[in-house]
């Protein structure tokens, strides 16, 4: 890309990789003309751990605990995609109840992801208070995860080929419903604090604007794409899991700037709450304690002992072989499209396991939208993209 003409002697400044606003070990080599950004070169790779090669030397069950170390704000999404790929290649069906449990975990993770984006983003532009609020809400999600999976943040190790590791514990659905009813007003609280705050709006409106055509041409996904007016969400497009059972809408904006990306993520949290409440109510078999009681009452012939009421289709043996063939599968995470290209050769480990991270693709547009911006705007624009270097570098 061509550099802008400079009025003064250009100065090269390094931001990161240890700067607190870099959202991980990202280094930006920025060329400045006074206060204006002339050029920017992101330097990545500081957190590369060879995840794809690790996947090619592990069975699926062995690899699932690794993946939440990639995007440590959205481990459930990577667990889901890592089991979805061999499932689809081997044509393994997933029980309806297991699919609902997966959706519950994914939507909780979407809210947790957006909360962890919201706090640091606002801290970057000078609003300190919400940073403490978001951890109060995330604690509730941690508690729900801990009850279901045994772990709070990462290494939940909950998704399995054909379903999930275990059924939801007694009382979990009621706690999840309580959380949803409690969290709805908290989003209103954030909006009251932030959305119409004139200082906040003047600070970020018009910053880092991306047109609809640019968003499509740069292969953006997630809130970055939808904030530019493209109504594209893989939950609606690919019809994976059981998202078609629920009534919800895609959140979009048209301005394509930092403020639009903020609004899209806030609205996505509301839509996730709608999905969670419907899933808690409609899950096949209902709460675990009711399901077990019905099975005991009706005996062996009970319909509740059928396939769709199980939490896993059939526990996959450690010797499960990934069949010959290749396949690309994708899903909508909090950051955008994450995907896995898997190539099997009838062995317990895949021959090729390529991971597509949403934030790596979204980060590529950063030099383009930083040109002409001020030094003070770098952190606001980078923060609005939502990058986690664990998944960018893998």
Curated annotation (Swiss-Prot):
Catalyzed reactions per annotation: a plastoquinone + NADH + (n+1) H(+)(in) = a plastoquinol + NAD(+) + n H(+)(out); a plastoquinone + NADPH + (n+1) H(+)(in) = a plastoquinol + NADP(+) + n H(+)(out)
Q: What keywords are assigned to this protein?
A: Membrane, NAD, NADP, Plastoquinone, Quinone, Thylakoid, Translocase, Transport
Highest taxon above the source species = Bacteria
Q: Does the keyword Hydrolase apply?
A: no
Provide the GO biological process annotations.
Answer: photosynthesis, light reaction
Hydrolase: present as a keyword of the record?
no
Q: What is its EC number?
A: 7.1.1.-
Query: What InterPro entries does its record include?
Result: NADH_Q_OxRdtase_suD, NADH_UbQ_OxRdtase_49kDa_CS, NDH1_su_D/H, NiFe-Hase_large
**Main role?**
NDH-1 shuttles electrons from an unknown electron donor, via FMN and iron-sulfur (Fe-S) centers, to quinones in the respiratory and/or the photosynthetic chain. The immediate electron acceptor for the enzyme in this species is believed to be plastoquinone. Couples the redox reaction to proton translocation, and thus conserves the redox energy in a proton gradient. Cyanobacterial NDH-1 also plays a role in inorganic carbon-concentration.
User: Can you name this protein?
Assistant: NAD(P)H-quinone oxidoreductase subunit H
Species, as recorded: Prochlorococcus marinus (strain MIT 9211)
What lineage does the source organism belong to?
Bacteria, Bacillati, Cyanobacteriota, Cyanophyceae, Synechococcales
